[in-house]
Amino acid sequence: MSNRKLGRTSSQRKAMLRDLTTDLIINETIVTTEARAKEVRRTVEKMITLGKKGDLSARRAAAAYVRNEIAIKDFNEETETFPTALQKLFNDLAKRYEGRNGGYTRILKVEPRRGDAAPMAIIELV
């Protein structure tokens, strides 16, 4: 299975996709270029599928990819803590998509970027 180069070296591309995947898990919607959105869709779908599995092996595989960032938006009143992106993936998103087999994301095309007219898109969790 091939992937888009996105004008970067393989290590830069992998880091960018990890960052975008983590951002999408935390914020549930991001604005990026169309090509990046299509690549991020692949990784996010895989991460949510791992979240639905929920076993130790799936948790370790997801932890190896998703950054250890705090989901600031989701403050837990009971424990007075902020969950990490990984906790949100396995606790919230896995429950939300329990009955759905794939198709967890939606890509909406928007107007081109002003500076270079790059095709832009909004990618969001359904």
UniProtKB/Swiss-Prot annotation:
The GO biological-process annotations, alphabetized, read as: translation
The GO molecular function terms of this record are:
structural constituent of ribosome
A Pfam entry, by short name: Ribosomal_L17
Q: Which domain of life is it from?
A: Bacteria
Q: Which Gene3D superfamilies match?
A: Ribosomal protein L17
Q: Which Gene Ontology cellular component annotation is one that this UniProt entry carries?
A: cytosolic large ribosomal subunit
Q: Does the keyword Cell wall biogenesis/degradation apply?
A: no
Q: Which SUPFAM superfamilies does the UniProt record give?
A: Prokaryotic ribosomal protein L17
Q: Keyword ATP-binding on this protein?
A: no
InterPro entries, alphabetized:
Ribosomal_bL17, Ribosomal_bL17_CS, Ribosomal_bL17_sf
Keyword annotations of the record: Ribonucleoprotein, Ribosomal protein
Q: Which family does it belong to?
A: Belongs to the bacterial ribosomal protein bL17 family.
Record's subunit section: Part of the 50S ribosomal subunit. Contacts protein L32.
The UniProt entry, under NCBIfam families, shows: L17 (TIGR00059)
Q: What is this protein called?
A: Large ribosomal subunit protein bL17
Q: What organism does the record attribute this protein to? A: Lactococcus lactis subsp. cremoris (strain MG1363)
Q: What is the lineage of its organism?
A: Bacteria, Bacillati, Bacillota, Bacilli, Lactobacillales
- Name the gene: rplQ
